[in-house]
Swiss-Prot record:
This is Aliphatic sulfonates import ATP-binding protein SsuB 1. InterPro entries: AAA+_ATPase, ABC_transporter-like_ATP-bd, ABC_transporter-like_CS, ABC_transporter_ATP-bind, P-loop_NTPase. Residues 29-243 form the ABC transporter domain. ATP binds at residues 61-68. Its EC number is 7.6.2.14. Its main location: membrane. SMART domains: AAA (SM00382). It is an enzyme of class 7 (translocase). Belongs to the ABC transporter superfamily. Aliphatic sulfonates importer (TC 3.A.1.17.2) family. It comes from the Bacteria. It is found in: Cell membrane. PANTHER family: ALIPHATIC SULFONATES IMPORT ATP-BINDING PROTEIN SSUB, TAURINE IMPORT ATP-BINDING PROTEIN-RELATED.
Length: 260
């Protein structure tokens, strides 16, 4: 069930509320006419977006185009907007910086923010799922970058999200750790079945993981394409390379010069 995190459905006219409820059942995310301005400048400008339940969507775009702002709005962290945003009640977000509390053991970090008094076993289960059970009693400062990011993912997973929001979660990782983290996220998504919105600058990562790739420019979704490639994706597949090149061109990268 989705809710409008910015404007209660009860304030809408009955017909509008009924239509939104129907749309929510068919969508994990529904955004209509979203505008977000800073100092009179629209960073997001009358944006429309749908994400289907269980769909993995990657969002590309140059720095400053509004990607992270959109993700923060979907997460409910920024509500100074115009327009309508419908998202699931159960959602979670993981950022590039894991944001672990240094004075709490890893398993306690995983449980941060959960209502009630969840048992340690809840954290242990999530840590096992991300391959970090052996570090549950460690202090965050002793974790590697990849381990810290996995702890952040575990903290998101314990919320049993219907929507997982990922804001460049692999950006600070070295190449090998990044590949492992990408594989882990893909496996978690297939196992959990939740909708995922991944904000990234990495075109190859987007094609590798997503069902659909969006390109954001000047505050709107300027382009989108389905990734009609079998899983697991093969980066040596000519169709993979073609789609990567097409997306790079949409982002203003001269692929002919890149090849040269």
């Amino acid at each position: 069930m989705a809710t409008d995190v910015h404007r209660p459905l009860s304030t809408q006219k009955a017909a509008t509320a009924a239509a939104q409820a129907s749309t929510a059942a068919a969508s994990a995310v529904r955004v209509d006419g979203l505008t977000r301005s800073f100092d009179g400048r629209a960073v997001i400008d009358n944006l429309e977006l749908d994400v289907r339940p269980g769909e993995f969507v990657a969002l590309l775009g140059r720095s400053g185009c509004g990607k992270s702002t959109l993700l923060r709005i979907l997460a409910g962290l920024d509500r100074d907007i115009e327009g309508t945003v419908l998202v699931p009640r159960r959602k979670a977000v993981a950022f590039q910086a894991p944001r672990l509390m240094p004075w709490k053991k890893v398993w306690r970090n995983v449980l941060l923010g959960l209502p009630g008094k969840p048992e340690r076993a809840v954290a242990e289960q999530a840590l096992t799922e991300v391959g970090l059970a052996h570090r549950s009693h460690a202090w965050p400062k002793t974790l590697s970058g990849g381990e810290a990011q996995r702890a952040s993912l575990a903290r998101a997973l314990v919320r049993e999200p219907d929507l997982l929001l990922l804001d460049e979660p692999f950006g600070a990782l070295d190449a090998l750790t990044r590949i492992k983290a990408q594989r882990l996220v893909g496996e978690l998504w297939q196992r959990r079945g939740c909708a995922v919105l991944l904000v990234t600058h990495d075109v190859e990562e987007a094609v590798l993981l997503a069902d659909r790739v969006l390109v954001m420019d000047d505050g709107v979704i300027a382009y989108e394409t389905e990734v009609e490639l079998d899983r697991p994706r093969d980066i040596t597949d000519p169709r993979f390379a073609e789609l990567r090149a097409e997306l790079l061109e949409r982002l203003g990268v001269d692929t002919a010069a890149e090849a040269a």
